[in-house]
Amino acid sequence: MDSAEVLSPSDLALAQPAKIVYLDQNKWIDLARAVAAPEDHPEDRILLEFLCAKVEAGQIRLPLTASNLYETHKLNDPEQRFNLAHTQATLSRAEVFRGHRRRLETEAALVLSKLYKMEWAEQDPDWVFSTLFLEAHMEADDPRLETPIPEHVLALMRAYPQQAMLDHLAGGPDDIRRAAISKFEAGCDALRVDIEARRIRHEGESESMRRKIYSVLLVLDQQDILIAAADRVGLPWERLKDNNGSAIRALVRETPTLLIEREIALKLEAQARPIHVNDMRDLRNFSTVLPYADIVVAENQFTNLARQAGLGDRFGVGLETDLRSLISIL
């Protein structure tokens, strides 16, 4: 190779895809404190500046999840909420992981297209990410929206995604904020109740049998999304009953969102403690980020559950608990 063709370290970094790094909410709180009071949090400030430089250089991306947005949105102290929202909107560049329905439908469609050797692919290789913050919950054109969002409003949000995220998280009427929080919490609590009831109902079963039961229940709970996935690839839903349901079993086994929820839920059920709403938020978070992140920095409990379930190896994601470890990893 001619010496003129040798890439510099900075050129080489730009030629490589940015690493996807997911931070759970407590890590974001640490960074926000380093923004507000750098002299009180010198080590976190060093890390903050390190991450800012990596984001600016295009070497990492720090997308948020619906749970991140919820946790920030629910803070009652306006100043604290603004500081955290500003930190997240700036470092994430308003990028979010898409919501449960879009992810599950697309993942299932990809699995079905491979199972049935059908010519179908998601056109956008970066489909799982969006810079419309609301798409962490549902698509902007989702027919389930009670009030459709006017196109000129969406255009403004697309033009100024960080400001749109900041305005949503830190501003707006308090009654609307509280209503959104209650709706999110209700969904998490419904999942918690289901898992607790299933744990009691199948207490004497082996883990293998509980895995089979949970697989069936997942398909039943998500069948409208799975039918939509079959429609996307042009596959009649009835075909999934072929070979005594082997396709349905493969669907649960190969669809990341379903697999992760099943495996972590089984680990949760096996613990000798009550299951809390916070567990459901973490469960949804891990189901969202594990298939698409290069590094996940989260709390000990769910990191350990994911490791025990072999999910880090399954998806090739680094599972970390110490925010400062990123300096040596990245």
Predicted regions and their residues:
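Long, positively charged, glycine-interspersed low-complexity recognition regions
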Residues: 1-10, 45, 58, 82, ...
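Conserved aromatic-histidine-acidic binding/catalytic patches
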Residues: 13-14, 39, 60, 73-76, ...
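Non-catalytic, alpha-helical, charged scaffold/linker segments
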Residues: 93-228
